[in-house]
């Protein structure tokens, strides 16, 4: 891989990003990096994010050939300085160019939504693995899968990687023979221009509800919605859950850049939806069976363009929850648009396991434990409502906390969800407190709970102890919900990632200890 200065500057000019160049020489970069620790001879270095000038000095010492920044730095004296008006946009464009535009060799399905992205991504990944004979890459909150060998599978750091990492991983996937990619796209990826210039074959919009609003994230819900909608603007075909909040706004955003024949809408049968203009629901689904182990639903095409995909049928999923049926429907339709058949979905959906998403742990005498990433009002409410419908006897205990430094709206949201669904017991605990006091966060959540409806609330800031307390207090017919962290193997505390065994491991180990 390499990038010559002449086409690089032309690309920046084309997108009106180039301000000026100092110390221009004729060079070809043989490496790109925003991390000074990874710089080697011939590297084009990007000064981004929480940049400190000493990083540029280090990059220069290690052999950086030039740097890209929004201003010149004395530490880069003597190096060609490519000065741009938006560092993140420039890095995305030049990263794609350096890696030879690998996105052009992939059929890309991109997924956004406040909740359900990871579940939908795994459903689609399994369907397409069947239809493409395992030529499918996956970029999710949990994993980055670039090929079929063990060394091609990694745990993810971000829902959507930094642009240089994203295009590097796409290049590796293409070189490994992958033909399709399923990727989650976060609102922050658009807010921070990590994916500027990237286009998708199919863009899925699952839902939107208040989340990620606060300092260090989105200043308003309108900004959050706008960033989510950018996925549709950049997709050749758009697939929208018509039951989402702000549906009319979302639909018109898609329609502004996409022909009506390339917009597909789906909804649960009987859903109360106001359709704008001449919009039609293309697919509807209805639940046939739901329990604590699986869901079964029927999918029906209603329009001619939908019928051409031949996806009508009955499907089972191994991930329980009626709300996950909508995620499965999105995956089925998107995979159909990528060439998969109904049979590909039928054969795979009932064998999908997603770590930390409705993960069930059985015990002999301490009830059933569910570990789920539910981390906002909408996801917690839907999870508790589903479990209550499935529970004929016994109590429900919820263990949760809220993150510090961001997502402030989650705290009243948790209080509201708990008040509405009225679990029998709640243990408020720690969940990535950052630079905030976890007890202060817990008491803020508690302040939004109606104590006439939720009477039994405890505070236990050691999350492992909180989980053990919940299990200790449960009997055979009870349910314990461990919400918010899923499979996260760390707690973010005072700027550090402190290792954490994961909710799943703590629960399993403790049950084994109690029942051996």
Curated annotation (Swiss-Prot):
Signal sequence region: none
An individual GO BP term: regulation of cell shape
Top-level taxon: Bacteria
Stored Gene3D superfamilies: Mur ligase, C-terminal domain, Mur-like, catalytic domain, MurE/MurF, N-terminal domain
PTM remark: Carboxylation is probably crucial for Mg(2+) binding and, consequently, for the gamma-phosphate positioning of ATP.
Classification via InterPro entries: Mur-like_cat_sf (IPR036565), Mur_ligase_C (IPR004101), Mur_ligase_C_dom_sf (IPR036615), Mur_ligase_cen (IPR013221), UDP-N-AcMur-Glu-dNH2Pim_ligase (IPR005761)
GO molecular function, one term: magnesium ion binding
Binding residue positions for UDP-N-acetyl-alpha-D-muramoyl-L-alanyl-D-glutamate: 36, 159-160, 186, 194
Record's subcellular location: Cytoplasm
Entry annotated with the keyword Membrane: no
Protein residues bound to ATP: 113-119
GO cellular component: cytoplasm
Enzyme category, top tier: ligase
Coiled coil segments of this chain: none
Any single Pfam family the record assigns to this protein: Mur_ligase_C
Keywords: ATP-binding, Cell cycle, Cell division, Cell shape, Cell wall biogenesis/degradation, Cytoplasm, Ligase, Nucleotide-binding, Peptidoglycan synthesis
Transmembrane segments: none
E.C. designation(s): 6.3.2.-
Pathway linked to the protein: Cell wall biogenesis; peptidoglycan biosynthesis
Residues modified as N6-carboxylysine: 228
UniProt family annotation: Belongs to the MurCDEF family. MurE subfamily.
Role this protein plays: Catalyzes the addition of an amino acid to the nucleotide precursor UDP-N-acetylmuramoyl-L-alanyl-D-glutamate (UMAG) in the biosynthesis of bacterial cell-wall peptidoglycan.
Name listed for the protein in its UniProt record: UDP-N-acetylmuramyl-tripeptide synthetase
Gene designation: murE
């Amino acid at each position: 891989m390499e990038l010559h200065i002449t086409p690089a500057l032309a690309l920046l000019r084309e997108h009106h990003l180039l301000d000026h160049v100092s110390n221009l020489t004729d060079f070809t970069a043989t490496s790109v990096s925003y991390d000074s620790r990874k710089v080697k001879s011939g590297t084009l270095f990007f000064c981004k994010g929480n940049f400190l000038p000493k990083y540029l000095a280090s990059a220069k010492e290690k052999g950086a050939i030039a740097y890209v920044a929004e201003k010149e730095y004395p530490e880069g004296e003597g190096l060609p300085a490519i000065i741009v008006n938006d560092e993140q946009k420039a890095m995305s464009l030049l990263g794609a160019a350096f890696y030879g535009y690998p996105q052009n060799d992939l059929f890309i399905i991109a997924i956004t939504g406040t909740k359900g992205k990871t579940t939908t991504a795994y459903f689609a990944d399994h369907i397409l693995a069947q239809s493409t004979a395992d030529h499918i890459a996956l970029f999710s909150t949990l994993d980055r899968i670039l090929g079929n060998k063990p060394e091609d599978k990694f745990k993810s750091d971000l829902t959507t990687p930094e642009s240089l990492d994203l295009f590097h991983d796409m290049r590796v996937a293409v070189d490994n023979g992958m033909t399709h990619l399923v990727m989650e796209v976060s609102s922050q990826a658009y807010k921070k221009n990590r994916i500027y210039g990237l286009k998708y074959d199919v863009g899925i919009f699952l839902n939107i509800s208040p989340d990620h609003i606060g300092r260090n994230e989105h200043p308003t819900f309108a900004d959050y919605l706008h960033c989510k909608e950018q996925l549709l603007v950049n997709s050749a075909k758009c697939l929208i859950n018509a039951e989402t909040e702000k549906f009319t706004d979302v639909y018109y955003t898609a329609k502004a850049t996409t022909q009506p024949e390339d917009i597909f809408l789906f909804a649960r049968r009987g859903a109360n939806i106001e359709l704008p203009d001449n919009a039609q629901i293309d697919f509807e689904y209805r639940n046939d069976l739901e329990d604590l182990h699986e869901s079964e639903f029927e999918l029906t095409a209603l329009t001619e363009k939908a019928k051409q995909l031949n996806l009508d049928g009955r499907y089972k999923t191994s991930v329980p929850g009626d709300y996950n049926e909508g995620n499965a429907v999105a995956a089925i339709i998107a995979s159909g648009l990528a060439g998969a058949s109904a049979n590909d979905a039928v054969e795979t959906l009932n064998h999908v396991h997603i770590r930390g998403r409705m993960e069930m742990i059985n015990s002999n005498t301490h009830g059933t434990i569910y570990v789920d990433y539910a981390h906002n009002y909408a996801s917690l409410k839907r999870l508790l409502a589903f479990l209550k419908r499935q529970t004929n006897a016994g109590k429900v205990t919820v263990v949760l906390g809220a993150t510090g430094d961001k997502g402030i709206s989650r705290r009243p949201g948790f209080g509201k969800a708990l008040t509405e669904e009225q679990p029998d017991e709640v243990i408020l605990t720690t969940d990535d407190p950052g630079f905030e006091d976890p007890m202060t966060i817990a008491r803020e959540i508690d302040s939004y709970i109606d104590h006439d409806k939720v009477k039994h609330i405890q505070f236990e800031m050691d999350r492992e102890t909180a989980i053990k307390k919940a299990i200790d207090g449960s009997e055979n017919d009870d349910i314990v919900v461990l919400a918010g962290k899923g499979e996260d193997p760390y707690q973010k505390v005072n700027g550090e990632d402190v290792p954490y065994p994961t909710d799943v491991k703590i629960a399993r180990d403790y049950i084994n200890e109690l029942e051996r």
